[in-house]
């Protein structure tokens, strides 16, 4: 797995998710398996089979999260001093069609959440913004065609 950028907050969120899966979910599933064993014949025991499936899925999630954490490149965005857009930038854009301002922060793909205006570094809008500076006009290609934005401000602050 290739290394990928992530903010400190995103890294801690993945760590918390891993701890929950290992120490809460795993324990609950183990208890469910033990309880299901008490129902008798395991070959026809739906509760046992369901608990074993949940165990398998949980273990896969744990494995995936451990790999993500091992390959994460944690970026402390508040220490970035740049006037051009890179990973971690909070950008203020003016949509040239609607004349509305929008604010996004460019984060890692595992921490992107459009409801919080956190966009993945791999998203089309982030890719169009990388390397740009305040005052630049950006074209973002979407399924509905091109959209144009003016980049008003670039900041490196925590979200």
UniProtKB/Swiss-Prot annotation:
Q: Which GO terms describe its biological process?
A: DNA-templated transcription elongation; regulation of DNA-templated transcription elongation
Q: Which PROSITE patterns match?
A: GREAB_1, GREAB_2
Q: Keyword set for this entry? A: DNA-binding, Transcription, Transcription regulation
A Gene Ontology molecular function term for this protein is: DNA binding
Does the record bear Transcription regulation in its keywords?
Answer: yes
For this chain, the family text in UniProt reads: Belongs to the GreA/GreB family.
Q: What does this protein do?
A: Necessary for efficient RNA polymerase transcription elongation past template-encoded arresting sites. The arresting sites in DNA have the property of trapping a certain fraction of elongating RNA polymerases that pass through, resulting in locked ternary complexes. Cleavage of the nascent transcript by cleavage factors such as GreA or GreB allows the resumption of elongation from the new 3'terminus. GreA releases sequences of 2 to 3 nucleotides.
Name of the protein in question: Transcription elongation factor GreA
Query: In which organism is this protein found?
Result: Orientia tsutsugamushi (strain Boryong) (Rickettsia tsutsugamushi)
Tell me the name of the encoding gene: greA
